[in-house]
């Protein structure tokens, strides 16, 4: 038998970003990361995902850290490893659409401060919302990876994935990621999907999933055998549950096969030992809830992400209507269909979930409609894969005319205004971008930073008389 050609699988390590975002609410501090960077740099990872997603907001809001400073420190430490971030297309790292000038400047500064690979996605898979970020990444000589949100439904056939993969390659992306945020992709479906993508594109394929439904490691195995080039894994202390499969386990799985990573398990063991106390402490304080470490099979039954299920429970609990849970679960696919079958990822998951709860609690569908539901129906988030239900759209938006263009085409440049508003706090160019994304949170952080630098607490200072209590 002819020798099988070696094709080592590449690994993106998520322990510094998605792993702690998924398990401990993004609370790992920069100081907890830095001592292990040197060892992580010796592994030979394809990349370390360490920035973007919710880390930016969490740094400013909860940890009182400058996210840009974190990036610079990590860049100093990782001499041989590419650094990767997650970027929400036209939403950047926030929750609204921004003008192109903000997107371009954010990309420029991210790369200037040390990012090599930008993973760019849109919650509706509307690739018009990715164009500006991709062009900006290429202009700054970065690696533009486009991520497609994986989901199930009538619209999402193998032809759909094959076709969109080709369009992504034509856009100038350097690689393609399938982002399975809910852990819906099962092993044999992964084989079919990877093969279909390989027919549509020559780009390297990266698979990102979560262990929520218990199938993720098997899914990776079948995907790699089908030709997947890169998989996202997390060091074992912060793996499994709502996080990713464990790095060490996947390394051992492929040892001695054509997909052998060649990583050193002894070195990985030393890295894991660094994160173990962080896990123990999080369990002790309750930051890591053992519930998120279990297998949530409802995810597969209802095709709903785990985080969305827990949101529904708390919404119904608040309303004292927990007995309506089953009805809401059955209403979700109906609302999703009415809304053009979007992938269920932030913010579409929250919009569809809240609307389903209201439909059930009101006893009448679309009697009460939050403004986000209206925004989706007006096309303000972008284009869905399938058309909206016209009757539902009419009921929600009345005589208003929906937009059909790329939403950001209607947003005038915003940087000059942000520069003006942020002028009094600005100590570095990047501060304006922090302010642009999270104005109130950034302002609080800037005040905190100033107090630390001047050793003055603005809250007790008498500014009028320039006096300070001793």
Segments the model singles out, each with a brief description of its role:
Residues 11, 19, 40, 120, ...:
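Conserved, mostly hydrophobic/aromatic
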Residues 52-169, 176, 183-187:
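Active-site beta->alpha loop and helix N-cap motifs at the rims of alpha/beta catalytic domains
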Residues 1-24, 71-76:
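N-terminal amphipathic alpha-helix/helix-capping segment at the start of soluble metabolic enzymes
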Residues 120-123, 180, 226-243:
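Glycine-rich phosphate-binding active-site loops on the catalytic face of alpha/beta enzymes
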Residues 35, 39-59, 289-299, 303-470:
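Terminal or standalone catalytic/regulatory effector modules within metabolic enzymes
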Residues 239-261:
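C-terminal helical cap(s) of enzyme catalytic domains, especially alpha/beta-barrels
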Residues 156-168, 213-229:
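Catalytic cores of alpha/beta
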